[in-house]
Swiss-Prot record:
Cytoplasmic topology ranges: 1383-1408
Species, as recorded: Ajellomyces capsulatus (strain G186AR / H82 / ATCC MYA-2454 / RMSCC 2432)
Residues spanning the membrane: 1362-1382, 1409-1429
Annotated protein name in UniProt: Vacuolar protein sorting/targeting protein 10
Gene: VPS10
Keyword field contains Lipid metabolism: no
One of the record's GO cellular component terms: cytosol
Biased composition (Acidic residues): 1474-1491
Role of this protein: Functions as a sorting receptor in the Golgi compartment required for the intracellular sorting and delivery of soluble vacuolar proteins, like carboxypeptidase Y (CPY) and proteinase A. Executes multiple rounds of sorting by cycling between the late Golgi and a prevacuolar endosome-like compartment.
Glycan-carrying positions: N321, N970
Amino acid sequence: MILRRLLLAGSLLLATAFTSAKKADGPKISVTKFKDEPVNLFYFDDSDTVMFQDGKNGDVYVSRDAGANWDIVDVSGMRGKAWSLLPHPTDRTKAYIMSKGGTHWVTEDQAKSWREFTVDAELSRYEYPLVFHGKDSNRVMLLGHKCNGLDCKERTYYTTDGFKTVHLLMENGRHCAWAVSTPTFGEGLDLPKEVNDRIFCVVSGLHSSWAEANRLLYSDRFFKDEQGTEVPLDNGRAVSGVIRTASVQKYILAATKSARTNELALFVTDDASTWHRTEFDGHRVEEDAYTILESTSYSLQVDVVSTYSSTIGTLFTSNSNGTYFTRNIEHTNRNMYGFVDFEKISSIQGIILVNTVKNWEDVEKSNGVQKKVISKISFDDGRTFQPLKVGKHDLHLHSVTDATNSGRVFSSPAPGLVMGVGNTGGHLKDYLDGDLFVSDDAGINWRKALDDAHKYEFGDQGSVIVAVFDEGRTDKISYSLDHGKNWHKASLPDGVQIRAKVLTTAPGSTTLKFLLLGSAKADIGMEYYIISIDFAEMEERTCEEKDFENWPARLNEKNEPDCLMGHKQFYRRRKAQADCFIKKKFEEPAPEFERCKCTEEDFECDFNFVRGEDGKSCIPSRSLIAPEGVCKNPDDKFTGSSGFRLIPGNVCIREGGVDLDKQTERVCSETFKNPPAGQIVVEKSFFTADYYKDYFYLERKESSKGEDETVIMITSEQQIFLSRDHGKKWKQILEEEKITRIEPHRFFDDVAYFLTNNGDGWYTLDRGDTFRKFKAPLPPNQDKLPVLSFHPDRRDWLIWTGADECNGNGGNCHSVAYYTTNLGGEWHFLMRYVRRCEFISRDARGSSDKLVFCEQFENENPSNKHLQLLSTEDWFAEKRLHYSNILDFATMQEFIIVAIRGENSQDSLRIGVSIDGKTFADAELPANVQIPIQRAYTVLESRTHAAFLHVTINNIEDHEYGSIIKSNSNGTSYVLSLSAVNRNSRGYADFEKMQGLEGVAMANVVGNVADVENGAAKKFRTMITHNDGAEWTLMRPPDKDSEGRSYACSTKGGKPTDACALHLHSYTERADPRDTYSSPSAVGIMIGTGNVGDYLSLKSKADTFITRDAGITWEEVKKGKYQWEFGDSGSIIVLVPESTPTKTLLYSLDEGRSWKDFEFSEVEMQIQDISTVPSDTSRNFLLWGKEVGQGKKPGLATVNIDFSGLKERSKQCVLDEKKPEADDYYLWEPKHPLQPNGCLFGHRAKYHRKRPDKDCYNGRELQHLDSIGDICECTRSDYECDYNYEPQSDGSCARVAGLEPLDPKLVCTENPKAVEWYEPTGYRRIPLTKCQGGKQLNHIVAHPCPNKEEEFFKKHPRLRGIGLFFVILIPICLAATAGYYVYNHWDGKFGRIRLGETGSGGLFDRDSLLVSIPVSMVAGVVAVITALPLLVSSLWRSVSGYVRVPGGASSRRPYSSRDSFAARRSDYVGVVEDEDELLGTDDFDDDEEGDERNGQV
């Protein structure tokens, strides 16, 4: 124990000491006054040295006599710079003074001396700055950050020698911790040596910075020469979404959370290598809804929030490996900060004091109900609880949630002494209504000690108890020398009267000295006192043997010493009535143990067993594993685990005791759970309704417990059906309610709302397991607008848009918005006359959780049709007007995009864009995309740090099309990505991004635009991009069809042409928009229906195609059009005929290479849809349709197709993260079709994909992205055309005629920290690319920003003086020397020609290889002499490109072609007109004049 008391607040100054020498019958009290409040006060363990920090002026104080006298720590450079004062948690000699900058100080001798150390970073703004090793105090990590302008990176440093040297561990680590973080970690285990060096770090995802992509890495080499190894948390597989890790006793826990759920998964290890997922007896564990409590060396204690209230929990205790948790007590009292009324009595095993909520049912129904809190105590480690008793009355004590002192609330190492403030009666009253109570038998019996609330502390192993009045100001202290039976008072000297803030003593409570911190009013503000209370001078005698008793720490119901963990516990403590002091300073009382015979309580459930419903038996949690070769038949028997094991660390006596872990005979049938049937299983269900109106999956996410696959359906008869097993069995729900619509939560897959027309509603938070009713403030609106708006991060926050004054009599019917933060428990008015209100996500914006945008009719008058866009961060107590007269707004990942009408009806729409939700900027649209009047935008997608918009060009019915424009990274500057993209009358466009792989998208364009403008029907072609819309190409058709025949058209050299390409039916033709080409879990695979030819043909003539390499190559799998669905992350693909009655389906187990027929119905069915869970990870599929053949049954039918029993999919695939290609998986690298080096977005990524020939299943969602390998050099594919530039037929970018690029100097004004600006080149980097070096097409000619010349030239040093002289001279000298040598040694000399000679074959013969270089160099002499004036000119102009030089060129032409640029190095700053000649690239001169006229680069 180091820090038992932590103070909150200010500092000190002034040091005026008053000393009052008390009589022998009272303590000596010394008072020191300070101007500012002390903070971070702590004792060095086993010493009288105390320190605290003046948080106001940055000084640190130290006392070496337990607080009687104080000195400022005066080390060179430290005064006034202390930002925090931190004791080492396990080393009693060390402490750290941290400054805000990079200089800090450490002491290793209890503040006698200090040593300075520096780190090249500021302290972390989000984490505790130091992370300590549990066993080696010299090993510490420091968490900091370093900023370069607005770009800040988290940095983690480490030391292994107590900060004598400091090393960088990693950048951008979100949280790092030592594996050995506690002194007890690994006790009793033979851990490998490398675990002592092991570090765990939570880092961002490879492709995403969102929390759900976080990874947990470890390294045994401080991440030297490695990126770390991903921790296999779940059965050998890595898990994404790691929030953080925590160490408690001998356990390390890791919490993970998947996207779209609040539910967490907790993983635990006790050896830093093998991890297990924890199970909480069927209870959900949610984010910010659990608290890891003080635990033991043999179990973890965790309090988990109850389902519907954040301030009521359930206490769980784990088995010895932390895997299985059982409920101890329900309805524990918590507060909104996660503190729980729970405390273990210090130094005594098994005694726990908790507070619970008596009226929990009422509290869960309404947040306005006041909790009635009662106290309970357990003497058997939480198995049973009983009330606290003062005589016959129940006692209730204030606990952790409203603690008023630092350190423990009730107890200390003083054996058996427990105190608290509370009251007797039915429940706990206010703190100020409480009295002080004491128990000296560890909580069995209690008595009142003092009237009114007091702070209290124990000293001299309980011989002395000190208390101070805590309901107001006081000038006295109280103390007891007989376990709180009798009390005495002592006055503070010189009339000092204070409001007590902290009463504390040295850790261990073994000294006779106490410290009291208090405040008092001063002439100006407040003043503070530290009061030293010393009982040593009372001159009591030292206790002798007769003054002690052998006290049993725990008693059972018979008042006999009780056993726990196989032993009884006793303490030798001073008798209450003894008139003596123990005086064993810094020597804590040691317990004595007496072993007991083993009982049932000494055993726990063995691995793979859990407690049965009776709470006594242990039943298998999964199928048992029999010895090899034993179980040949289900009826065979084998000897296996009884289900029990002795709790590790338990020392009970086996002989004569209970023996629950004795092996027992088991039946082999227990080793098979759901034995594979070897075939596909079908379950068909019928409904009275004719068809379904809609269905929704409430998908269980990776971090969610359970095995359910929940589907909810609403039928044409308004019936609601629920299935928890993917449609095998259905049950009707909410039968008595008139449900008119179902609203699944947009952001949380566990949640759905069921609404009626009168404002009543129901919701589920657990995927239909339970339902709860709510009442809305108004009926749903009548404007066909969304009724509910959901918060992206806060599950319980809603906005309800209801109808007001809509009584059917004309009236003033309008929509009004209300909000709730507790699932409709309480509603609050937000705004009237609204069209729509939305919560805005804060993740990418750093804004408030309360950021809300609303569209409101101007002047609250719907008739004028003018909508204004308003926002608020305080529920419209204050509001901000962004735009008037808007058309609509949309939110998409990073961007908020607004369509604004012009002032006149003839004006085109404008676009406003914001990233932070506060500041909007007008978007710069490409001039070659004209937006006609009253025509719309469609916001397509923005997951790749750029917004895609479809801008309507032709809005005539059945002739609609438009252009896709793409933004830069802040959404303000748009360029044309693709023209003539098809859309329909509802505004939907034929555009779809591939799921699971960034940057790949497909779109259907109108191929006959000129004809369409004249009234002809549209003809479509399919285009694909592999670099996020920078370049589009037609799709390459297969070489042969599914029957092995060639197509009627042919490609050109394997490349698609206008006359021969693959075209697929797209978004606008789908009956269900959820039926996408691709799946997020089947990486690289897409399926579509279409044809090969010049245009897309009718859908009735379509065939079905597949790609396995993200659209580079395609294969026809079947003639005709099919509906498709992916299962088990693509290891199962199912096809069913579309629009054709059938009783069979097709399935593939090898990514579509081969197909098998399966008959799922005896009667032909018309299948309307095929579905599975949205992640496509299930082995179950659901067909929706009707029977139409002979013997048909009426009504809607669903057919569940279950592949989990199929032999080929009955065994789970093996993935070894260290050897990802060793077993059932291989690493697949996506490629760009136009890049030979395999790079995509500037890097090579590798994805886990199951080997098609392996007979196994993937299981729950696989973390597909394995690694990002080499970072590639930049190429043309990493760039797109800049604003006012457009792509040419050869792929280059040329400026649109008559238009100018954006002012490049704006970067200097928009970013005050910018150092330079670059001349426009026509290119800009794709926001998604990670490339480095190579072609810098966007950064060629640089100029300094105003007043940034000095920083600019540090970044770009100039060549001048002697350096410039030698650059010119050295090539001339080398060429001249070589020429002279060749002239004097070559036998031919210049001008000598000999006909008919065969040559001497000498070293310097003309044919000698060695002559070729000197000849070139001689030729170079002439070239250099000729080029010298040009070289000097070029160098001069290069220098003048940086600064103004008299006579320097004021302008230069850009590179004239991509090829001429490629011939030069990217580190040239300027190039003169004749430099191509100098560098030998005159072969491009023919192109330059024309290219320059076109503005082509």
